Amino acid sequence: MPLSRREIRARATRFAKDFAHAHNEEADAKPFWLKFFEVFGVQARSVGSYEVHVKKLDNALGKIDFFWPRTLLVEHKSKGKDLNKAAIQAVDYLHGVKENEKPRFILVSDFARFVLYNLEEQTQTELTLDAHEIRPDGSDP
């Protein structure tokens, strides 16, 4: 059963509060993404994998932080890091992804900021995570 907008907003509020002080990629990224997907009723491990090894364009090995085949490639950085560099790194990983598994979206984040790239439409959407801007009753701020 799909979640209501109200339930998604309530979950998003809890998520934002729970991760308001997260900052370290190594320590906090996996639980962050597990809970992020739960906001939308998605069990991350049922749709994708963490730390997927791929061969980059320069033949060096890279590690995709989270990969949902045909849907999403996630690259995560510690809070305050350059998300443009993260996006370039994510695009470099595409070289090592099988053609029939290439994702529609790339999502980069540093806990506080998200940038979603739609590779098919060649658009990007930016969002800042702020628990104070999300209303648990489902209404818009």
Which residues fall in each region the model found?
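Nucleic acid-processing catalytic cores of prokaryotic defense/repair systems
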Residues: 1-141
